[in-house]
C-alpha cells in the first residue's frame, strides 16, 4: 500500500484513525480510500490482555440478551478489576488490563462474574484455579487451572472470540 503523504506510515494511519473509522471500516485519505479492519484487532497470541478482554466483554454483553444467567451491561474497557495478587505470578498468560491487588482487598470483576455464570461455576468475580479449569474444560484443553504465557487455552479462547464460536 502506498500513501500519498510519505510522512504518514500505514501503521500510524491505522493506529490514529482506528477510533474514528466509520462503520464501513473505511476512511477517505486524500484521494485514496483506506480500509482499517485490523486496527487494534485481537490476535491469537496466547496472552490474555486488554484486547482479549474487550472481545470477551462484547460477547458476554451479546450472550446476556439470550441467557438470563449472564447480566451483561459490561463496559468495553478491556479491564479486569480487583483480582487476587496471588494469581498474577501463577498465571503469566494474564497480561495487560488485569488489576492485581492484595488478596484481602480483592473484590472481583463484573466481567469475570459474567464469565463464571456463563461457565456455570461460582460467581465471585475472582479468577482462580476453578474458573480457569472450567474455561479450559469448555475449550477442550487440559484443565490444570493455570494460564501459562503463552497459553494454548488462551489461543483457543482467542480464536473462539475472533470467530464468534461459542460451541
Regions found by a protein language model. Name each.
Residues 2-167:
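Cell-envelope/ECM-targeting effectors and their regulatory/trafficking segments
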